[in-house]
A protein has these predicted regions:
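SIR2/sirtuin-family catalytic core signature
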Residues: 1-16, 232-321
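Short secondary-structure boundary/capping segments
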Residues: 19-29, 144-149, 265-266, 342
Length: 342
């Protein structure tokens, strides 16, 4: 049986957004204008996050991810009378609550007809590890439907399952109750950020509640959690799983500069004969250059991991369940995906 690892980026969620129609309600590229309710006041969340609100109103025509980038720019924030520590922290709180709402919508609209779920179902028993750069819980929702246990080093868990590493944070992560104790509320009265503590995973009914310390990296921000106790050991566990991986899927990875060190480390941890699957409608040229010299396949169908007839692209023989045979040309790529005989 082949071993499959998953590396998931924003394209995974965008795929589901198009499939389900969620993108017409909540465009994940424009979260600041979502109608996110404030857990403390019941009014609009942005109204309770004054520095972020001021930053956005000063840049109403900029793409939202560029606004978040400005939240990290101390010189710019100072030039308009803002404290960049507060703008970054309020950005984390906003993104955590906003994408909690988004995750609940994903769960409501989830369908087993979605092509990526069909692919995951076909390969359920081969999946040995997963790494996600997304805050949302779409991958977790799919794994829950498959009854495939996962573990992210959270304290409130029995400690078994495949590794699910979320180094940029997750909307259901929260610091342990006994690590830093106070009653969170919006507007913020306590400014708590970047403390390396243990974590718990929140239940779904707890997602739309104020956080003591939001755990999410702001878009365009280098990972500040890389050495944290819930990230570094999880990365080591994941990298150990990669050593025996036959296929590694990079699903919807943007390969932005801020993410490259983490993505490059994954690529460098893979066996030389591991087949890399780049599932992306527009594969980043820099990423293709990074994996050149290795066996790789590109899946760029906008409808997901399916062929022109809608059949799921398989990484095993559908009749026997055995691994696919490699092409005779010694490319290292399975025969049915190798272009040498087309």
């Amino acid at each position: 049986m082949s071993k499959v690892s998953l590396v998931v980026g924003n394209g995974f969620s965008i795929s589901f957004g198009h499939f389900s129609g969620l993108i017409n309600q909540l465009n994940s590229q424009e979260p600041i204008t979502w109608d996110v309710p404030c857990p403390s006041t019941g009014k609009k969340l942005l109204d309770s996050l004054q520095t972020l609100d001021t930053l956005y109103k000063s840049n109403p025509d900029k793409p939202h991810f560029d606004v978040f980038k400005l939240a990290l720019d101390s010189e710019y924030c100072q030039s308009i009378g803002l404290d960049s520590f507060k703008t970054a922290l309020e950005s984390r709180h906003f993104l955590t609550i906003a994408f909690s709402m988004y995750s609940q919508k994903q769960r409501e609209l989830f369908s087993t007809d979605w092509s990526w779920f069909r692919w995951l179902k076909l390969h359920r028993d081969e999946i040995t590890s997963a790494f996600s750069l997304n805050y949302d819980l779409l991958l977790e929702t799919a794994l829950d439907h498959l009854n495939l246990e996962y573990y992210s080093l959270q304290e409130n868990h029995h400690g078994y399952g495949i590794p699910l590493v979320k180094p940029h944070g997750s909307v259901d992560f929260e610091i342990t109750p006994n690590s830093i104790s106070y009653l969170p509320q919006y507007p913020l009265t306590t400014f708590c950020d970047l403390n390396d503590t243990r974590i718990i995973r929140l239940e779904e009914h707890e997602l739309m509640s104020p956080r003591r310390q939001p755990l999410c990296i702001v878009p365009n921000e280098a990972n500040k959690y890389s050495s944290y106790q819930w990230v570094a050991p999880a990365n080591q566990w994941f990298e150990g799983k990669l050593k025996g991986t036959n296929y590694c899927l990079f699903i919807g990875i943007s390969y932005f500069e801020c993410d490259r060190p983490e993505i490059d480390k994954i690529v460098d941890s893979l066996p030389k004969d591991c087949v890399i699957v780049v599932a992306n409608t527009s594969p980043p040229e820099e990423f293709i250059a990074k994996i050149s010299g290795r066996p790789y396949i590109i899946w760029n169908n906008p409808k997901g991991p399916v062929d022109e007839n809608g059949a799921v692209l398989s990484l095993k023989c559908l009749n026997t369940g055995n691994p696919l045979r490699k092409c005779f040309c010694r490319s290292g790529i399975p025969y049915q995906y190798c272009g040498c005989h087309c």
